[in-house]
Amino acid sequence: MKVIHKLNRTVSLVALSLAMLIAPLQAAANRHPAKPDRRKPIEKRRQSNNSTRADRRRAEARRRAEAARLAAAARERAAEEAMREQVQAMIAKDDISGEDPEIRRIAVNALGDHAGTVVVMNPKTGRVYSIVNQQWALSEGFKPCSTIKLVTGLAGLNERVIDPSNTTAISDSNRVDLTHALAYSKNEYFQQVGGQVGFSKMISYARLMGLGEKTGINARNESAGRVPISKTGFAVNHMSSHGDDFKVTALQLATLVSTMANGGKLVTPFFARTAQDETRPTAKVRRIVNIDSDSFQQMIPGMIGSVSYGSGKRAFDPQATVAGKTGTCIDHGTWVGLFTSYAPLNDPQIAIAVIARGADGRNHFPAAVAGRIYRDLNSRLGVSGNIDIASKRPANPATSVADTDTDTDEEEADAGEVVNDTSSTKVNSNKPVWGDQRKTAESKIKRTVMTLPSRPTQPAINNSPNQRTGRVSGRQ
C-alpha cells in the first residue's frame, strides 16, 4: 500500500509540474494568436498570377483591336467623304455641251452624292445623251470585275466551247447552264469557259468588243484602258471571271453592251455638239464584230435574268425589259461596282453603264442607279406599261437563289471576287436545282428571246494555234 501511495503522489507531482509548465505557454499563446500559414503552394500562387496577367493582356488586346477598328472605320469614312466631295467637284466641271438636259438631270439625280460615274447613250446611233463625271468615265480605268463575263460568254459561244442547252458542273453537287451562270454571275462556270477558250482568244474577243482601245468619242483625254499581255495556267481562268489586269472605262462598257444590243456593230460614241451631229442620219461604225448572231442571242436570257431575279435585280424595271450584267470586286484596295445594260429588249434605245468606287461600289448600287434612270425614262421611251413577259420576276423572289447566292452573290464574297464560289443552293436528287417560279421565269425569258428578230450572221474569228477544243457541257 505504501508503494502505491508513493506512486500516486509522484504522478500527482509530475502532473502538477506539467500544468505549471503548460500554463505560461497557453497564456502566451492567448496573447499572441498563431499567424496564418504563409506557405501557400507556390505553384498555385504562380498560376493565379499568370491567369490574372493573361486576362489583363487579353483585355488590353481587345481594347487595342477595338480602338484600331474604330480608327480604321473613321479613316475609311473620311476617305469616302473626301472621294465623294472630289467626285462632286469633277461633276461640276463636266462639259455638258451636246448633252440631253433632261437625261442629264435624271442621271445626276440617280447618282446623287455618291462616288461614281454614269454613261447614257443610244446603242444604235452612238449618240451620248449624258456622261456624269466625265473624268472618271473617259480617263479613269477600272477593273471590269464580273462584267468581263460578257466577253467570256461571247467567246465561249462563238468558239463552240459553250453548249447553251446543257448544264455544267461547277462543283461536286451544283450544275448550271449559261443563263443561270450569267444571272447569278457564277465564277467557276466562266473560269472553265475561259480556260478552254485560251488566253490569246480571250484577248482577241476583248479587243474585238472594243476593250484596250479608245472609243473615238469627240471629247478630250480619253483613255484606251488596258488588256493583259500574258497569262498562263489558272490565271487565264481567273482572268475570265474576274477581269484581272484589264482596265476599262465606263464609256467602253457602254459601247460594249451597245454592240450586243445592236447585233454586232461597234459604234463610235459622240456628243451632239454641232448641227451636223444633231442630224446625223446613221451611226459611225468602227467595225462589224466577227461574232455569230446566235451568240448574241444566247447571251440575252442570262442578262435579262440578272436584272429580273439575279445579281442585278436592283435595276429591275416593271415596265420595260432590261438586259444587263453586274460586277463587284476590289481594285487597288477599294471596292469597285459596275453595271452595264440596255433597254428595252425588243427595241434598244438606251444603253447605261455605271461604275462606283468605295462603299458605293458594294450591294449592287450601280444597278440601282441604272434602274432609277430606266424607270424615269419610261415615258420618253414610249413604254406604256405593257411589260414584256421576259422581264417578269418570280412571284416570290425571297425564295430564289438571288437571296442565297450573294457580285453579294459570288462577287463580294472576298476581296478580289472569289476564285471558288460554292453556291448555297446545291443539287438534291429529290428536289429541282432551281425553284419552280424562277425556273418558269427562265423558260419564258428564253422563249421570248427566241422570237426576237434574227441578226446578220458574221464569220467567226479564225482559230489560233493554241486554241483548246471542247464544249462546256454536262459531261464535265
Question: How does the language model describe each region?
Answer:
Residues S12-I22:
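Bacterial N-terminal signal peptides
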Residues A28-K93, R380-Q476:
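Compositionally biased, proline/threonine/alanine/serine-rich low-complexity intrinsically disordered stretches
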Residues D163-K186, A254-Y309, L381-E410:
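Conserved active-site-proximal loop/helix segments of enzymes involved in bacterial cell-wall
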Residues V236-D244, V248-A272, E278-V285, Y309-S384, ...:
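Active-site beta-strand/loop architecture of penicillin-binding DD-peptidases
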